[in-house]
């Protein structure tokens, strides 16, 4: 992220840029010292105390599918490819993932979410497109689609590298039969009953 500042003296106008690390959050105060010499060999040195205001950024990930946000808070919104997305957090609060899902809003950016357990449990008519969800920070998918008997959405692009619990994830998801063979399950410690009574599922997950 680059920031720009202009300063002037009686001799010249100085414009300089600096790069702000990605882990710097909005509201951070930085002390900046700039030293320069212009084309006429006129020196300049100055100090400034700056408070950053960083707007959230919604963007399409490099895989061309996942929608992510940087610097966002739950409830922030942003446009990506002509679609308005809302950033959500865990749980059932005002901007919780379960609250918005229950309201029928599936254009969600889930970068802040770590727990997706029971999100679509018993949602027997649910079959919406959620392939763009960012699951890179999710650790818990316990019973996520349990009894979601209509769901057969393409979620093969999900990043599951941090998930530890997939217990009963597709239990009784009777029509689900999508390719999830590329999922990274290296950190999963619980897969108990993951596909129990998932009658249609016959994908290669070896």
Annotate each PLM feature:
Residues 43-49:
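Extracellular and select intracellular beta-sandwich modules with Ser/Thr-enriched
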Residues 19-26:
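Short, surface-exposed loop/turn segments at beta-strand-coil junctions that are enriched for proline
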Residues 1-5:
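Conserved small/polar residues in nucleotide/adenosyl-binding loops
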Residues 17, 31-37:
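Extracellular recognition modules
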Residues 54-206:
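Negatively charged
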Residues 8-19:
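Aromatic sugar-binding surface patches on proteins
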Residues 26-32, 106:
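Exposed beta-strand face motif in extracellular beta-rich ectodomains
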Residues 37-43:
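Short, solvent-exposed loop/turn segments at the edges of extracellular beta-sandwich modules
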């Amino acid at each position: 992220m680059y920031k720009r500042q202009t300063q002037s003296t009686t001799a010249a106008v100085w414009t300089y840029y600096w790069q702000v690390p990605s882990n710097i959050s909005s509201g951070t105060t930085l002390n900046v010292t700039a030293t320069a010499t212009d084309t006429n060999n006129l020196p300049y040195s100055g100090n400034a105390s700056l408070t950053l205001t960083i707007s959230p950024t919604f963007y399409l990930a490099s895989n061309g599918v996942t929608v992510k946000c940087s610097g966002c808070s739950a409830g922030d919104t942003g446009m990506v490819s002509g679609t308005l997305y809302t950033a959500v957090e865990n749980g059932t609060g005002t901007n919780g993932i379960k609250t918005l899902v229950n309201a029928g809003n599936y254009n969600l950016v889930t970068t802040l979410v770590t727990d997706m357990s029971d999100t679509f449990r018993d949602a027997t008519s649910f079959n919406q497109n959620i392939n763009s969800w960012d699951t890179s920070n999710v650790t818990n998918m316990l019973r996520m689609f349990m009894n979601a008997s209509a769901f057969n959405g393409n979620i093969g692009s999900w990043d599951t590298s941090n998930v530890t619990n997939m217990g009963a994830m597709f239990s009784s998801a009777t029509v689900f039969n999508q390719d999830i063979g590329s999922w990274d399950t290296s950190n999963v410690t619980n897969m108990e009953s993951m596909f129990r009574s998932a009658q249609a599922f016959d994908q290669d997950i070896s």
